A protein has these predicted regions:
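Helical element adjacent to the flavin cofactor pocket in flavoenzyme catalytic cores
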Residues: 98, 129-181
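Residues at the C-termini of beta-strands that transition into short coil/loop
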Residues: 6, 23, 169
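N-terminal FAD cofactor-binding segment of flavoenzymes
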Residues: 1-8
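Residue-level detector of beta-strand face positions
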Residues: 10-12
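Rossmann-like flavin
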Residues: 14-123
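Glycine-centered secondary-structure boundary/capping sites
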Residues: 1, 38-41, 139, 168
């Protein structure tokens, strides 16, 4: 059971500690960006439109595949998107954001999702601007009962499927039947 957070998050900026923190609310990002940099609201709309398109493409063709059939990447939707995807795979997130926004606070907000990928905006491909679709357009959600409740729910599902869960033991091997590990 997910609950939308409002605000999704609150940002404190180094060097601006005497100013109130910035609340990032779903559906209000354009207004926030415009208040910090004239013209940034319109540019954010274009940025989020792109993020939404890339997110949809990734969700439909990359996120839920095991890549056993490379031909799946030759889907017409993916092929049509190649001219836009190429630069997003080759360019970095930081430069992608910097080309659109000047205010360092806006750059920090848009670069922050790289943290969830275990990297920095310098290393993350620009394609990962799709993450901004999730926090700025879809909204930040939190599982009722915390993330432990999510783990408990997943454990229940796999137990019902016949999986035996053992904790506090050392794993010495992974056995996979009828297919490679």
């Amino acid at each position: 059971d997910l609950r939308r957070l409002d605000p999704g998050y609150r940002v404190y900026f180094e060097g601006h500690l005497q100013e109130p923190p910035v609340d990032v609310r779903t559906g209000h990002a354009e207004t926030l960006f415009e208040s910090l940099e004239p013209g940034a609201g319109r540019r954010l709309r274009a940025y989020l439109d792109s993020a939404s398109r890339i997110y949809g493409l990734a969700k439909d063709h990359f996120l839920y595949t095991d890549f056993r059939r490379p031909a799946a990447l030759a889907h017409p939707d993916v092929l049509r998107a190649l001219p836009a995807l190429g630069p997003q795979l080759l360019g970095g997130l930081r430069s992608h954001v910097a080309a659109r926004f000047q205010d360092p606070r806006l750059r920090q907000i848009l670069g922050y999702p790289a943290v969830f990928l275990g990297t920095s905006p310098d290393r993350a491909p620009a394609m990962y601007h799709l993450m901004s679709h999730l926090d700025l357009a879809d909204g930040v959600q939190y599982p009722l009962g915390g993330f432990a409740a999510l783990v408990d729910a997943m454990a229940e599902v796999v137990r019902e499927a016949g999986v035996e869960i053992r904790t506090g033991v050392e794993a010495t091997a992974v056995e996979v039947v009828d297919r490679p590990a």
